[in-house]
Amino acid sequence: MELWRQLNQAGLVPPGLGPPPQALREVSPVEIPGQTLRTAGADTGGACDSLLWIREELGNLRRVDVQLLGQLCSLGLEMGALREELVTILEEEEESSKEEEEDQEPQRKQEEEHLEACPAPHPPDFEMMI
């Protein structure tokens, strides 16, 4: 499974998750050329046909499992690439916000100086009794 290997090398395999089952990593016995189902003796009431059907269905299920595993691995690799892209975007936004803060610093200082020049509101110097 090349995609699984790529996923593992990218560090995207969840911790504790081992390799795929051996049945998905090896060539299916159904796919081995020259391999046939042999029975000793006479056909016992269609048992051979049933076994062939079961074997064929198991092979179909295995193919579907391999396809699904491949799709999951592809999806994992794509998610890893998107995660890296997101990290890059967030870093760029952080840098631009720092630059904006640095650009706004002189303006803030001017506003503070202006506020210091204006006297703060305070209560009147006289008292009134009723």
Swiss-Prot record:
For bias type Acidic residues, the affected ranges are: 91-104
InterPro entries given for it?
DUF4530 (IPR029202)
What are the start and end residues of every segment in region (Disordered)? Answer: 91-130
From the record, give the cysteines joined by S-S bonds.
none
The UniProt regions of compositional bias labelled Basic and acidic residues, in chain numbering, are 105-116
One Pfam short name? DUF4530
The protein depicted here goes by the name Glutamate-rich protein 4
Q: What organism is the protein native to?
A: Homo sapiens (Human)
